[in-house]
Regions:
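N-terminal beta-strand motif that seeds the catalytic metal site of vicinal oxygen chelate
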Residues: 1-17, 71-76, 123-162, 224-231, ...
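C-terminal functional regions that serve as terminal interaction/effector modules
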Residues: 13, 228-238, 242-251, 257-337
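Hydrophobic, ordered structural segments
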Residues: 67-140, 150-152, 298-300, 305, ...
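Vicinal oxygen chelate
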Residues: 4-14, 62-85, 103-106, 144-155, ...
């Protein structure tokens, strides 16, 4: 009955060509197929095991008016979709009926979970008529899979949603963190499936009245939503360099960060210089180390953004990187005004 994998992510967008070009030409996704009906037009993109559906049209209009471009659906692969729906609804999820042949339940804000049969293969999202596309323009693919989804929630609701994902979909609590930086703060809980294929980082501002980045996100987004999608790569320095050349804007990291990093990684001087050149952040956990960098949001409301992440043994999220990434977003927000 538990959710086992993420089958696809669906974005609702106002400018589909711009959104598809960003994912395809800049981030390296391949345009696989398209589908259209009276209510919408969708493009399916794929890279590694990650499928992204970009949808525009009347189906998306209400979502876009309220929230702007963003993630509308995180589809779960389940061993038994009927039992999964019953469990989720029993734990408090809103039953949204059957859409395109699959049960759908509500979650946080406007985001839904379509429930589909789990599969060892990457399958086309069901219930639509897909027409294959030939995409000769996709650059070298660096992304292997979706590492985690960061979800921004309202202050005071973090425990509620951590319990919800535990009870409704069988995810387990993995870790928690609290960050306080210059008067703004972030509370977080990580929940993860037993398969390790679903990881949600639930984040919320420490106070509903603060002026930090999470409250700013909630205001621009019209409530809770997906803050970022983290994309796992094998070589983040190459991935960032190539994506930058193709027009992806990444957050900047101050030089002083790398001076301190040299003390924490005394045997990695060559690596640190490569990280400095690409603004990539580094941290350790008890299993290894991880490298991360955030993009700027490519969407009109400056809400959803992306992360590139490389894991060299690390399974969790280093405390130093959580703080450094939070500070990077906060700096960028203050500079942008």
């Amino acid at each position: 009955m538990a959710a086992r994998q993420i089958a696809f992510i669906e974005l609702y967008v106002s400018e589909p060509k711009i959104a598809v070009d960003y994912l395809g030409d800049a981030l390296g996704f391949t345009r696989v197929a398209e589908s259209a009906d009276d209510e919408s037009r969708s493009i399916l993109l794929r890279q590694g095991r990650l499928q992204m559906v970009v949808t525009a049209g009347a189906e998306a209009a209400r979502f876009l008016d309220a929230h702007g471009d963003g993630v509308a659906d995180i589809a779960f692969g389940c061993d038994d979709v009927t039992a999964a729906r019953a469990r989720a609804v029993g734990a408090g999820a809103v039953d949204l009926g059957t859409v395109r042949g699959s049960p759908v339940v509500g979650s946080f804000g406007p985001v839904r979970h379509t429930l589909v049969p789990a599969s060892a293969e990457v399958l086309l999202p069901g219930g639509r008529t897909w027409t294959p596309l030939v995409d000769d323009s996709a650059p070298e693919q660096r992304i292997r899979l979706l590492d985690h989804v960061a979800i921004c929630l309202e202050a005071g609701t973090l425990e509620q949603y951590a319990d919800f994902y535990t009870d409704a979909f069988g995810l387990d609590r993995y870790s928690s963190e609290f960050i306080d930086v210059g008067g703004s703060s972030m509370d977080s809980i990580v929940v993860r499936s037993s398969s390790d294929d679903i990881t949600f980082t639930l984040v919320a501002p420490g106070s509903a009245t603060g002026s930090g980045q999470l409250n700013a996100f909630l205001h621009r987004n019209g409530g809770p939503g997906v803050q970022h999608l983290a994309l796992l790569v094998d070589d983040i320095v190459a991935a960032v360099s190539e994506a930058t050349d193709r027009g992806v804007a990444f957050l900047q990291t101050p030089g002083t960060y790398y001076e301190a990093l040299a003390d924490r990684f005394p045997d990695r001087s060559a690596m640190i210089e490569s990280l400095r050149a690409t603004n990539v952040l580094a941290d350790r956990d008890e299993w290894g180390y991880l490298l991360q960098l955030f993009t700027r949001s490519p969407y009109p409301r400056n809400t959803l953004f992306y992360e590139l992440i490389q894991r060299r043994g690390a399974r969790g999220f280093g405390s130093a990187n959580i703080r450094a990434l939070y500070e990077a977003v906060e700096r960028d927000r203050l500079i942008a005004g």
